[in-house]
């Protein structure tokens, strides 16, 4: 933690003590491990923005074995960071998750291809193996292939789908012509492994018109019936977005704050600074209020994801402006 954090935390604690108030507790469950993808929350904690709102926030890192929906369902968090496809799937299956804010305005999903595989345009996909993440991340891909009219059955006229792990080995080892990458993470792992940008062709889901909303904030619907909870979440969202804007303006400092909070020691300064620079492009230009048009595009993409769609009908009540209206009134 930085000296600034201790100073602000101390001042906030004194203010709370003097007023006779006690901090409201909030537990946030992240979608993945501690990294710059979640910088705004760590910055809000480090810079005292949560304390200024009278909040005591616990940030729980995620990982490959952590499903945010399961955590909040079991009472392990008040609010979670999740991608909208996962949240909508959980809602259709009976877990009433509601999006209360959308810090990520744009998607970071992309398909990164080796030029020497012969893939430099979407028309080149047939006959090749493409690496795809599953666990809910596959649906935009299948929607894209459906839009292109390309089968995913491994036929000569279609593509072979490789269930990709969370690494870039299939591309480096030529097991796949293309793999799934995030603009802020795996793409740079490919570059750091020795490949040059000019040796690669990148297809961004945003550009292909099949991007779905990624890191949003979700709560259990029933909780929103309590005005006190809505007010608490408004404070949390307001402070979190203040953290995100600070991170956009101070990307290197934000990356260092993330590193300070990485208890695993697995992250590196170089990678986190690189990541923060890309993340800032995804959060820029929004105060965290969900754009209904982005929501509709996400739903439409998911409903056209081939023979096994993540949702089977248009959701109802899956998002609200109740929190952001209070936060930014």
Q: Model segments located where?
A:
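Pocket-lining segment of extracytoplasmic ligand-binding domains
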Residues: 85-86, 166-263
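Periplasmic-binding protein-like
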Residues: 103-113, 197-223, 277-279, 317, ...
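Conserved C-terminal helix/tail region of periplasmic/extracytoplasmic solute-binding proteins
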Residues: 296-329
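N-terminal signal peptide c-region/cleavage motif recognized by signal peptidases
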Residues: 18-20
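Bacterial N-terminal signal peptides that target proteins for export
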Residues: 1-9
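Short, glycine-/small- and polar/acidic-enriched structural segments
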Residues: 25-165, 170-173, 177-184, 203, ...
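Short helix-capping segments at alpha-helix termini
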Residues: 49-52, 148-154, 193-196, 264-265, ...
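Secondary-structure end/capping motifs
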Residues: 225-308
């Amino acid at each position: 933690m930085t000296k600034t954090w201790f100073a602000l935390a101390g001042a906030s604690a004194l203010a709370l003590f003097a007023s006779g108030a006690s901090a409201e507790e909030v537990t946030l469950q992240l979608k993945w491990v501690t990294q710059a993808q979640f910088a705004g929350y760590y910055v809000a904690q480090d810079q005292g923005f949560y304390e200024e709102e009278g909040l005591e926030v616990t940030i729980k890192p995620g990982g490959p074995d952590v499903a945010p929906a399961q955590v909040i369902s079991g009472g392990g968090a008040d609010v979670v960071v999740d991608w909208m496809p996962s949240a909508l799937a959980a809602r259709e299956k009976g877990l009433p998750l509601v999006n209360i804010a959308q810090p990520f305005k744009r998607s970071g999903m992309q398909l990164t291809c080796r030029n020497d595989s012969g893939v430099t345009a979407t028309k080149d996909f047939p006959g090749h193996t493409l690496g795809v993440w599953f666990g809910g991340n596959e649906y935009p891909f299948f929607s894209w292939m459906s839009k292109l009219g390309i089968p995913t059955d491994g036929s000569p006229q279609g593509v072979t789908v490789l269930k990709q792990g969370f690494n870039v080995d299939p591309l480096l080892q030529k097991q796949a012509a293309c793999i799934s990458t995030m603009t802020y993470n795996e793409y740079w792992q490919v570059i750091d492994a020795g490949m040059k940008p000019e040796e690669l062709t990148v297809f961004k889901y945003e550009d292909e018109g099949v991007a779905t909303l990624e890191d949003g904030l979700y709560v259990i619907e029933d909780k929103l019936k309590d005005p006190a909870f809505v007010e608490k979440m408004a404070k949390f969202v307001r402070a979190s977005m203040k953290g995100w804007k600070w991170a956009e303006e101070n990307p290197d400092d934000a990356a260092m704050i993330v590193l300070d909070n990485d208890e695993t020691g697995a992250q590196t300064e170089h990678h986190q600074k690189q990541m923060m620079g890309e993340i800032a492009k995804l959060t820029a230009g929004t105060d965290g209020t969900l754009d209904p048009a982005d929501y509709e595009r996400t739903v439409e993409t998911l409903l056209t994801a081939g023979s096994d769609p993540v949702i089977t009908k248009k959701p109802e009540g899956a998002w609200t402006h109740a929190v952001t209206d209070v936060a930014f009134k």
